[in-house]
Curated annotation (Swiss-Prot):
Organism: Zea mays (Maize)
Protein name: Translationally-controlled tumor protein homolog
SUPFAM superfamilies: Mss4-like
Major localisation: cytoplasm
Gene: TCTP
Domain TCTP: 1-167
Pfam families: TCTP
Organism lineage string: Eukaryota, Viridiplantae, Streptophyta, Embryophyta, Tracheophyta
Length: 167
């Protein structure tokens, strides 16, 4: 199994159990999240407590719907960015990320990040923002949005900000 860690924070953000599609010349990875239900399992043992004189047990059996990627990697939702704060974040992120990338990868990232940033800016009002479990300020952000008519959220990652780890 392959796990993808954030190069800047070390947080696990993705794994190869989620297939991705490359966007913006490979600078962004697009991954579809799925809603899953968590909660107690409904077990019917065939007994009828009211017919047997027993009382109905009051159990908190509320099921919760979560997005699999958010739950699996314990992603933390962040407040939304306005355009000014988003551009400021991207500039800081480019600086921090290119400092740790190999020169060839840094050049590749710099060439493609402008198109990726424009793509993200075009969806800014629809995006949700997530960071890894450590919630570090300079960490990579996973961006999520719903495509037209979709019930599952689509996540976007900067591919150059992920480090592949074999488990």
């Amino acid at each position: 199994m392959l796990v993808y860690q954030d190069l800047l924070s070390g947080d696990e953000l993705l794994s190869d159990s989620f297939t991705y599609k490359e966007l913006e010349n490979g600078v962004l990875w697009e991954v579809e999240g799925k809603w899953v239900t968590q909660g107690p399992v409904d077990v019917d043992i065939g007994a009828n407590p009211s017919a047997e004189g027993g009382e109905d047990e009051s159990v908190d059996d509320t099921a919760v719907k979560v997005v699999d990627i958010v739950d699996t990697f314990r992603l933390q939702e962040q407040p939304p960015f306005d355009k000014k704060s988003f551009v400021s974040y991207i500039k800081k992120y480019i600086k921090n990320l290119t400092a740790v990338l190999e020169p060839e990868k840094a050049d590749e990232f710099k060439k493609g990040v402008e198109g990726a940033t424009k793509f993200l800016l075009s969806k800014l009002k629809d995006l949700q923002f997530f960071v890894g479990e450590s919630m570090k300020d300079d960490a990579s952000v996973a961006f999520a949005y719903y495509k037209d008519g979709a019930t599952n959220s689509t996540f976007l990652y900067f591919s150059h900000g992920l480090k592949e780890i074999k488990c």
